[in-house]
């Protein structure tokens, strides 16, 4: 079996909740990922499900691990927006794994700043959505708006719960001004 251990899927533009574009959080437009004033080209059609499946078939890839979009780690977002965005992203990834279990293993993300919400979301994703992989950024913005390593002691409860639930943990490089 051939497994691609690091893949990303973009939701189609009509799948992204309106509030995310209205608030400048994330949307797709003119073949670009958009976030506030930031733009990044969608460099390959295989970022979308239909083309991803074609790409996997043409490259003889049996299964792919779908990681979360780093644009949606929710650094600097208020608690309500963080909750809504993370829940959207995790539900989207769960739907992919549910609809194509033979093709995808989906990860989910939490924001360590809001530790109680993060722990609840881990339980929801692992138990209710049956997602086996917790995706974490290398660092995140803390309550003082300072970049903090994911290895900080404040994050220990996340790792303890992941261990209790027998989750795989993937730490994804994340670009930030400083760490």
Task: Mark where each language-model region is.
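Helix-coil boundary/capping segments in enzymes
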Residues: 1-179
């Amino acid at each position: 079996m051939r497994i691609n251990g690091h893949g990303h899927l973009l939701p189609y533009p009509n799948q992204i909740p309106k509030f995310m574009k209205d608030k400048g959080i994330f949307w797709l437009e003119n073949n670009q990922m958009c976030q506030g004033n930031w733009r990044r080209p969608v460099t390959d059609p295989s970022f979308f499900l239909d083309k991803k499946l074609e790409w996997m078939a043409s490259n003889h890839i049996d299964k792919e691990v779908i990681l979360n979009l780093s644009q949606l780690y929710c650094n600097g977002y208020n608690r309500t927006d963080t909750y809504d965005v993370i829940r959207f992203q995790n539900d989207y990834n769960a739907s992919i794994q549910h609809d194509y279990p033979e093709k995808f293993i989906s990860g989910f993300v939490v924001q360590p700043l809001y530790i109680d919400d993060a722990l609840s979301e881990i339980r929801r994703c692992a138990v209710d959505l049956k997602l086996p992989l917790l995706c974490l950024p290398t660092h995140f913005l803390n309550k003082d708006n300072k970049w903090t390593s994911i290895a900080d002691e404040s994050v220990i409860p996340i790792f303890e719960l992941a261990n209790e639930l027998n989750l795989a943990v993937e730490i994804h490089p994340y670009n930030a001004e400083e760490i």
